[in-house]
Amino acid sequence: MRILGMILALLLMPVPAAAQVVISFYSHDLGSTFPHAFITLKGKTEDGQVVDTNFGFTAKSVTPAILMGSVGGKIETSKPSYVASSDRQFSVKLDDRQYASVMALVEKWRTLPGKSYNLNKRNCIHFVGEVAQLVGIKVVFEKDLLKKPKSFLLSLVALNPWLKGS
């Protein structure tokens, strides 16, 4: 009976919630800025690090030059109001290894040399698409969707039915 009491006591002890970071894929429709795709990361790592950030890839300066070819690019973190006015398309839970891989990819894009942004070949959609592939999402870079963030992200949901409603 004493052992049963000890087992019951152990079962009733509070258990810390499993650490987890959630990555969400967002689109921002045409408004005061051009359409954009980006990711958010929120949660807590196994070592207790609180994560609450977002990343997108864009031109350093939005000028007509982006229509002509490659220009300087940058990883950008948007203000909470921008994120709030954007549309979350889907989310995926990450373990610490996946989170570290995403952060390494963000750093890779942050340190791309030279004129790293190209509206047709390396834009925000290419960035979020590469992140999506990294976390196990099937991605097809359809040419007609490479300037349409929302349509591109919705195409990923169609390719990966398990994302629907996430």
PLM features: what roles do these ranges have?
Residues 27-28, 86-95, 110-118:
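Second-shell loop/turn segments in exported
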Residues 79-80, 89, 114, 143:
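Generic secondary-structure boundary/loop-capping signal
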Residues 21, 104-166:
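Activation targets extended, charge/polar-rich intrinsically disordered C-terminal tails
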Residues 15-19:
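Sec/Tat signal peptide C-region and signal peptidase I cleavage site
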Residues 20-88:
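Glycine-rich catalytic cores of cysteine/serine-nucleophile enzymes that process amide/ester linkages
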Residues 31-35, 92-102, 117-125:
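Solvent-exposed, acidic/flexible segments
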Residues 5-14:
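Bacterial N-terminal signal peptides
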Residues 1-2:
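N-terminal hydrophobic targeting signals that begin at the initiator methionine
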